[in-house]
Amino acid sequence: FSGKKFVNPDLARKVRQAAETLGYSVDRVASQLRSGRARVIAIIVPDLEDVFLGQLVSRLEACAQEAGYEVIVSSSRNDEAVQASRMRAVLGWRPAGIIVVPCLNTVAPDLLGEIGDVPIVGVDRIHPSTVDFDTVTIDNYRSGLQAVDYLAQQGAADVLLAIARRDLHNIQERVRGAQDAAAAKGNIVLDVVAI
C-alpha cells in the first residue's frame, strides 16, 4: 500500500480489490511505528477566510497529496496564543513537517524549542532574519516600489495604499517601498490607510 516497493501490477490490483471489499484502510498509527513520523504535514495559517491564504493552503494540499502526504490545516485566528496551542497540538501527531504563516513576524522561540527535529517552514508574514528555519517570502519592498511605479506609468498622481495591519514586517516593507517610489517620482501623493 505504501507504493515504495515494486509489486506485480496484477497482484497489486487483486490486493486493492480485496482491501476495498473488506473495507480495509491503512492504520496510520501502525505505519508510523517504523518511521516515527506520520505522513502528515501540518499547515497553520492566521485566517482561513483570507483569499491568499486559502489559495496557498489549497496548493500546498495538492503538492502534499502528490508526494504521498496527508494534510492537517488549522487557523490560528490571528491570535499568537491560539497559534502556539495549534502548533503544540499538531506536534502530538508527530508530523513529517509543519508549514506556518505566523500571526506576527516570527514564531515564539520557546515554541520552536518544543518542535525538536520536526522540519518547519515559515511562509509570508515572517522576517527571515529572525528565525533559524527555512522561509518562503517575497521581496515585499520591491513589490511596493513596483506597484507605485506601475500606477505612476498609468498617470496616477494620488495613490491610496490600503493595508490590513501595520505591525506585520511584510506590510511594513511594502509600505516602505511604496513610499520610496512615491518620493522618487516627486509627483505622487501616497496615503496609507489601515482597514
Regions found by a protein language model. Give the residues of each.
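Short, well-structured alpha-helical segments in soluble
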Residues: A81-R94
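Flexible loop/hinge segments that line or gate small-molecule binding clefts
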Residues: R77-N78, A96, V100-Q146
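Periplasmic-binding protein-like
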Residues: L91-P102, D158-I163
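Short beta-strand elements in bilobed, periplasmic/extracellular small-molecule ligand-binding domains
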Residues: A64-S75, L160-A162, A178-I195
